From Swiss-Prot:
GO terms for cellular component: mitochondrion. It is found in: Mitochondrion. Keywords: Mitochondrion. It comes from the Eukaryota. This is Uncharacterized 5.6 kDa protein in COX1 intron.
Length: 48
């Protein structure tokens, strides 16, 4: 439960980062990096 909980918290924080990056155009190059982090966390969560 702790691992799943911490993963969910990380997912939420990365989602907030995505929103911030979408709002700030100067950080556009970081968008793809954070998208990869989100998708990898989400893909890691599905099998478990």
């Amino acid at each position: 439960m702790d691992i799943i909980g911490s993963g969910f918290i990380r997912f939420k924080y990365n989602y907030i980062i995505i929103i911030i990056i979408n709002i700030i155009p100067e950080l556009m190059p970081l968008k793809s990096v954070n998208f990869l982090i989100i998708t990898s966390l989400y893909a890691w969560k599905i099998p478990k």
